[in-house]
Curated annotation (Swiss-Prot):
It comes from Drosophila melanogaster (Fruit fly). This is Large ribosomal subunit protein uL10. Residues 291-302 have a biased composition (Basic and acidic residues). Residues 280-317 are annotated as: Disordered. The modification Phosphoserine is found at residues 302, 304. Ribosomal protein P0 is the functional equivalent of E.coli protein L10. Keywords: Cytoplasm, DNA damage, DNA repair, Hydrolase, Nucleus, Phosphoprotein, Ribonucleoprotein, Ribosomal protein.
Length: 317
C-alpha cells in the first residue's frame, strides 16, 4: 500500500512539474539552504497570487523535465543548474518584482557551529556587559579586551569570520552571548529562466537607460574605429561626409575650383573686411537690443522721480 501511494505521489509530482512549466513562461532556480519549513510557508504566503514555489528532490525534478523535453526542448538548459538544495519559483509577473519579494523574505539567524559563513562578520568595539569570568572566550579568539567597570570591553573592531569560513563552537557561542545574529537566510536566486533563455539574476538590475547608454557608447566607438581606418558604415558615414566636405572647402579655397558652397568662403578670403562687416552686423542687433532694454529700464526710474517731484510741489504749494 505504501509503495502504491509513493508511486501515485511521484506521478502527481511529475504532472505538477509539467503543468507549471506549461503554464508559466518564467521561473527562478532558487537555493534553499538553511530555510526552515516555517520560513518556507511564510514565503509561499507572501508570493500568493504572484508566484508559485515548487520544491523537491533534484532527481525527481530532472526526471520530470527530461520527460517533457519532447514538448519543450528549451527546458534542457535548466538541467545543469539543478544541483544542491534548489527549487523553482514560477511566475507570470515582473521578474524583478518577484526577486525583490524573495529578498524581503530573508530572516536574521544566529551563527551555528558548522555553518558556512556567507559574508564577513565583524564584532564591533563595545562594552559587552559580560563579567570577567567570560574572558576565556575572547582569548580563544584573540580578541583584545580590557576590564572596564567590572565588565569586559572589546577595544577594537574585530573580523571574526570571512566568506567560506566554517563557524566554530567558540565563534558561535561568543556571537550568541553578544546577541549578534550575523547571517540572514532565505531563497537565493541562482538563475533566471525566461521563455527559453537562462541568465544570471544580475541582468534584472539593468535598466533601459543603461542599455541605451551602452548602445550609444558602442555606436560612438564603432564610428571612431571606422573613421580611423577609413571603412564606411552607417555610424561613421555622417562624420565622413562632414570631414570630406571640410576638405573640399579647403581645396576650393586654395584653388580655382568653383561650387556654390565655396563662394562665400572665397569672397571672405579675397576681402577679409567683408567677414568683419558681417560679424559686426550680426552683433549690432544684439547690442542694440541690450541698449534698448537698458534705456527701458532707466525710463521708469526717471518717470518715478518726476512723479515724486510733482507730488512734492503739490504738497507744499
Amino acid at each position: 500500500m505504501v509503495r502504491e501511494n509513493k508511486a501515485a505521489w511521484k506521478a502527481q509530482y511529475f504532472i505538477k512539474v509539467v503543468e507549471l512549466f506549461d503554464e508559466f513562461p518564467k521561473c527562478f532556480i532558487v537555493g534553499a539552504d538553511n530555510v526552515g519549513s516555517k520560513q518556507m510557508q511564510n514565503i509561499r504566503t507572501s508570493l500568493r497570487g504572484l508566484a508559485v514555489v515548487l520544491m523537491g528532490k533534484n532527481t525527481m525534478m530532472r526526471k520530470a523535465i527530461r520527460g517533457h523535453l519532447e514538448n519543450n526542448p528549451q527546458l534542457e538548459k535548466l538541467l545543469p543548474h539543478i544541483k544542491g538544495n534548489v527549487g523553482f519559483v514560477f511566475t507570470k509577473g515582473d521578474l524583478a518584482e518577484v526577486r525583490d519579494k524573495l529578498l524581503e523574505s530573508k530572516v536574521r539567524a544566529p551563527a551555528r557551529p558548522g555553518a558556512i559563513a556567507p559574508l564577513h562578520v565583524i564584532i564591533p568595539a563595545q562594552n559587552t556587559g559580560l563579567g570577567p569570568e567570560k574572558t576565556s572566550f575572547f582569548q580563544a579568539l584573540s580578541i583584545p579586551t580590557k576590564i572596564s567597570k567590572g565588565t569586559i570591553e572589546i577595544i577594537n573592531d574585530v573580523p571574526i569570520l570571512k566568506p567560506g569560513d566554517k563557524v566554530g563552537a567558540s565563534e558561535a557561542t561568543l556571537l550568541n552571548m553578544l546577541n549578534i545574529s550575523p547571517f540572514s537566510y532565505g531563497l537565493i536566486v541562482n538563475q533566471v529562466y525566461d521563455s527559453g533563455s537562462i541568465f544570471s539574476p544580475e541582468i534584472l538590475d539593468i535598466k533601459p537607460e543603461d542599455l541605451r547608454a551602452k548602445f550609444q557608447q558602442g555606436v560612438a566607438n564603432l564610428a571612431a574605429v571606422c573613421l580611423s581606418v577609413g571603412y564606411p558604415t552607417i555610424a561613421s558615414a555622417p562624420h565622413s561626409i562632414a570631414n570630406g566636405f571640410k576638405n573640399l572647402l579647403a581645396i576650393a579655397a586654395t584653388t580655382e575650383v568653383e561650387f556654390k558652397e565655396a563662394t562665400t568662403i572665397k569672397e571672405y578670403i579675397k576681402d577679409p573686411s567683408k567677414f568683419a562687416a558681417a560679424a559686426s552686423a550680426s552683433a549690432a542687433p544684439a547690442a542694440g537690443g541690450a541698449t534698448e532694454k537698458k534705456e527701458e529700464a532707466k525710463k521708469p526710474e526717471s518717470e518715478s522721480e518726476e512723479e515724486d517731484d510733482d507730488m512734492g510741489f503739490g504738497l507744499f504749494d
